[in-house]
Design a protein with these regions (language model features):
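Sequence context surrounding c-type heme c attachment/ligation sites in exported
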Residues: 35-39, 64, 68, 129-139, ...
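The feature marks the first
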Residues: 26-77
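The canonical Cys-X-X-Cys-His
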Residues: 34, 41-47, 99, 135-144, ...
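Gram-negative bacterial Sec-dependent N-terminal signal peptides
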Residues: 1-23
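Stable alpha-helical elements in mature extracytoplasmic
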Residues: 30, 37, 63, 70, ...
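Electrostatic cytochrome c docking/interface patches
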Residues: 21-38, 52-55, 105-132
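Axial heme c-ligation environment in periplasmic c-type cytochrome domains
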Residues: 52-58, 74-115, 150-156, 174-199, ...
């Protein structure tokens, strides 16, 4: 009897914990359903949302509002990628919400900076921007530790692969990526960054914890 009671308490505790994680999210989705739907995602993003390829983003721990917004952008065509656009076309709104809260619930993998020799430059840009050419400090939107801003749909950057981040900044600068919408906030910033700035920033945020 005692063993049955202990098991019931343990199961109830786990259920409440899972519910709490979901309740804390700003997106109305099911973690359990998202996990069941995530098999295809793991081929590129890894079984726990942490990609083994530096060109594919880590999405574990990424805030759900941002993930949901990007999935919708891929489906609607305001953001394009041969693989992601095709996958997003198959997803319903509920599928996207479930996947977003599932990956948000997973622990993000910690990484070190890619190039230690550029830390000072990357940190200066991230924390102070560049007043000479109008580059805003990254932490204003992405936070001092790169955790992002879920309510504003600003992504977490900490631990993100430097190669992936550099590609996104380059795409914003060239206009190949326009998913910042009418605000143009990322395009306006990225086009003012040099290649060296992009490399230093990308390396620095990879090591944020």
């Amino acid at each position: 009897m005692k063993n049955k009671l202990a098991s019931l308490i343990a199961i109830t505790g786990l259920a409440l914990a899972a519910t709490q994680v979901q309740a804390d999210s700003l997106v109305d989705g099911s973690i359990e359903d998202g996990k069941a739907k995530s098999l295809t995602c793991t081929a590129c993003h890894g079984p726990e949302g942490n990609s083994v390829s530096p060109m594919w983003p880590n999405i574990a721990g990424q805030n759900a509002p941002y993930l949901l917004a990007q999935l919708k952008a891929f489906k609607e065509g305001s953001r394009t990628d041969p693989l992601m656009s095709a996958q997003a076309m198959l997803l319903s709104d509920q599928d996207m919400a479930d996947l977003a809260v599932y990956f948000e619930s997973l622990p993000a993998a910690a990484q070190s900076v890619k190039d230690a020799s550029t830390v000072n430059r990357g940190e200066a840009l991230y924390r102070g921007g560049n007043t000479e050419n109008g580059v805003s400090a990254c932490l204003a939107c992405h936070g001092p530790t790169g955790r992002g801003n879920p309510a504003a749909k600003y992504p977490a950057l900490q631990g993100q692969h430097a190669d992936y981040t550099a590609k996104q900044l380059t795409d914003y600068a060239s206009g190949a990526r326009v998913s910042d919408g009418k605000t143009r906030i990322m395009r306006d910033i990225a086009e003012r960054l040099s290649k060296e700035d992009i490399a230093a920033l990308s390396s620095y945020v990879q090591g944020l914890k």
